[in-house]
């Protein structure tokens, strides 16, 4: 019997580049339980067409948490050039953070929303990519008061 796969639903948005930045993004990507590389390099699994990105900008790394039978993921920053924001937390070169069920990630103008749906397979996971026509991350603007 085949075990259901863990699914990452990944939505992508860029305010100025739009679909051009995501021209090489597949609709679906099935991947083994090794790290998934994101960047502008030809050897990345998720290749994004932005000159300010590093060839290897970040990775999504699956792992098995102690006491769990489901894949968990962490995001690791692979670039020295810039900061990657994950759920409001700034990360720099080689820093990593575990991902929850819903994750808001931004880097180099790209907004990425990653939703994890658990599955029983520990050998493989699948990503479904969606291009968003509108922003995925909203930051409230500071309001001035008379106080």
Curated annotation (Swiss-Prot):
Summary of the tissues where the protein is detected: Expressed at high levels in spleen and at moderate levels in lung, thymus, and small intestine.
Cellular component terms per the entry's GO annotation: cytosolic large ribosomal subunit
SUPFAM superfamilies given in the database record: SMAD/FHA domain
Gene Ontology biological process terms, A to Z: auditory behavior; cellular response to cAMP; cellular response to Thyroid stimulating hormone; cochlea morphogenesis; craniofacial suture morphogenesis; genitalia morphogenesis; hard palate morphogenesis; hematopoietic progenitor cell differentiation
InterPro entries on file: FHA_dom, SMAD_FHA_dom_sf, TIFA
Record domain FHA: where: 36-108
Gene3D superfamilies: 2.60.200.20
Disulfide bonds: none
General function of this protein: Inhibits TIFA-mediated TRAF6 activation possibly by inducing a conformational change in TIFA.
Complexes and interactors: Interacts with TIFA.
Name of the protein this chain belongs to: TRAF-interacting protein with FHA domain-containing protein B
Organism placement in taxonomy: Eukaryota, Metazoa, Chordata, Craniata, Vertebrata
């Amino acid at each position: 019997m085949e075990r259901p796969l863990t699914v990452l639903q990944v939505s992508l948005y860029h305010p100025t580049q739009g679909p051009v930045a995501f021209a090489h993004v597949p609709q679906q990507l099935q991947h083994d339980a090794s790290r998934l590389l994101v960047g502008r390099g030809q050897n990345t699994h998720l290749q994004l067409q932005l000159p300010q990105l590093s060839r290897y900008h970040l990775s999504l790394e699956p792992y098995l948490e102690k006491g769990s039978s489901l894949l968990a993921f962490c995001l690791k920053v692979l670039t020295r050039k810039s900061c990657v924001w994950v759920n409001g937390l700034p990360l720099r070169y080689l820093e990593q953070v575990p991902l929850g069920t819903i994750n808001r990630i931004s880097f180099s103008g790209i907004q990425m929303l990653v939703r994890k749906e658990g599955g029983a397979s520990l050998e493989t996971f699948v990503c479904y990519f969606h291009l968003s026509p509108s922003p995925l991350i909203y930051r409230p603007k500071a309001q001035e008061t008379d106080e």
